[in-house]
């Protein structure tokens, strides 16, 4: 079981994040990595959908490329790519398996290996110890952080993209499938930054618009001295409050930094914003965590 102790719960409430080392075994990590290798080996992405992923605001809006490919990925398993991996015709400049930034956004629902991890007894026990009554899974991602050029993730709050009313209802679970160290792009947090609300939001634009999203508000300039690095070993789980500010640096090392991450929402008494880029569909309503 993975229940939090009172001291762990207090630390999460104070800092907005919490590291749980050894949450998954090496065998559990290897099973997900083997499965993702199989998924990548069968990758078939049309030229017009080869969408580079970025969290820099202007680049992000440009990089969506195929608006529908991104906006309709919530109930599918789709591929998003690093910058600079395609030529002007959309052909790969690097081996395809080294080109991927992430795979999202419904591994938790559509793949049995990832569904099993997401709904495991350990995850359910963790959610219960956090007091979640009706948690649902809203999205999932497999993040590669490729060696030598795995892109940085700029400072952000997850609730900017997954907005709810009231706030404080979104929780990220980030699982290291490889050691995540300073050299290969571990997570960095500003402890206690989850108490000041959300500075900006990414919202859908009217149907047919290109790009399909825009930003309301702006990300303030953050004091870099406030960020604390959070290196973790393979198998660790990092709990991430939806409003805590976090980032990761570019991976310039020769080691990847693979991770599986998914987001929960407390559905009881919560409104999922209809302006969010991600929306439940008739084919895939947000599945309850508790089974």
UniProtKB/Swiss-Prot annotation:
- Keyword tags: Dioxygenase, Iron, Metal-binding, Oxidoreductase, Phosphoprotein
* Residues the entry annotates as binding 2-oxoglutarate: 102, 141, 156-158, 174, 248, 257
Q: Which cofactor does it need?
A: Fe cation
What positions does the entry give for Fe cation binding? Answer: 156, 158, 246
Q: Which SUPFAM superfamilies match?
A: Clavaminate synthase-like (SSF51197)
- GO terms of molecular function: dioxygenase activity; metal ion binding
Q: What residues bear Phosphothreonine in this entry?
A: 55
Look up the EC number in the record and give it: 1.14.11.-
Q: What class of enzyme is it?
A: oxidoreductase
> One Pfam annotation, family name?
PhyH
User: Any idea what job this protein has?
Assistant: 2-oxoglutarate(2OG)-dependent dioxygenase that catalyzes the conversion of 2-oxoglutarate to succinate and CO(2) in an iron-dependent manner. However, does not couple 2OG turnover to the hydroxylation of acyl-coenzyme A derivatives, implying that it is not directly involved in phytanoyl coenzyme-A metabolism. Does not show detectable activity towards fatty acid CoA thioesters.
Record family assignment: Belongs to the PhyH family. PHYHD1 subfamily.
Q: From the Swiss-Prot or TrEMBL record, give the protein name.
A: Phytanoyl-CoA dioxygenase domain-containing protein 1
| Gene name of this polypeptide | PHYHD1
């Amino acid at each position: 079981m993975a229940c939090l102790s009172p001291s762990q719960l207090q630390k999460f409430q104070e800092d907005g994040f919490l590291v749980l080392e050894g949450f998954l075994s090496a065998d559990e990590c290897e099973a997900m990595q083997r499965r993702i290798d199989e998924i990548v080996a069968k990758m078939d992405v049309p030229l017009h959908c080869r969408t580079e992923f970025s969290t820099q605001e202007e680049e992000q809006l440009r990089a969506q490329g195929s608006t529908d490919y991104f906006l309709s990925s919530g109930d599918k398993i789709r591929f998003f790519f690093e910058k600079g991996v395609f030529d002007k015709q959309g052909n790969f400049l690097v081996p395809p398996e080294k080109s991927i930034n992430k795979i999202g956004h419904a591994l938790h629902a559509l793949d049995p290996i990832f569904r099993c991890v997401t709904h495991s007894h350990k995850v359910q026990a963790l959610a219960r110890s956090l007091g979640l009554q009706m948690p649902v899974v809203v999205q999932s991602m497999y993040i590669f952080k490729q060696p030598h050029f795995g892109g940085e993730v700029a400072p952000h709050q997850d609730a900017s993209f997954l907005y709810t009313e009231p706030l404080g209802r979104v929780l990220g679970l980030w699982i290291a499938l490889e050691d995540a160290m300073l050299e290969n792009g571990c997570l960095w947090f500003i402890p206690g930054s989850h108490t000041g609300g959300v500075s900006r939001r990414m919202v859908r634009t009217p149907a047919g618009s290109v790009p399909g999203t825009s930003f309301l508000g702006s990300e303030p300039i953050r004091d870099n001295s406030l960020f604390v690095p959070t290196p973790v070993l393979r198998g660790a789980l990092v709990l991430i409050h939806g409003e805590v500010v976090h980032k990761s640096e570019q991976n310039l090392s020769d080691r990847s930094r693979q991770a599986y991450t998914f987001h929960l929402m407390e559905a009881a008494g919560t409104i999922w914003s209809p302006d969010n880029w991600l929306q439940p569909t008739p084919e895939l309503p947000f599945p309850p965590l508790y089974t």
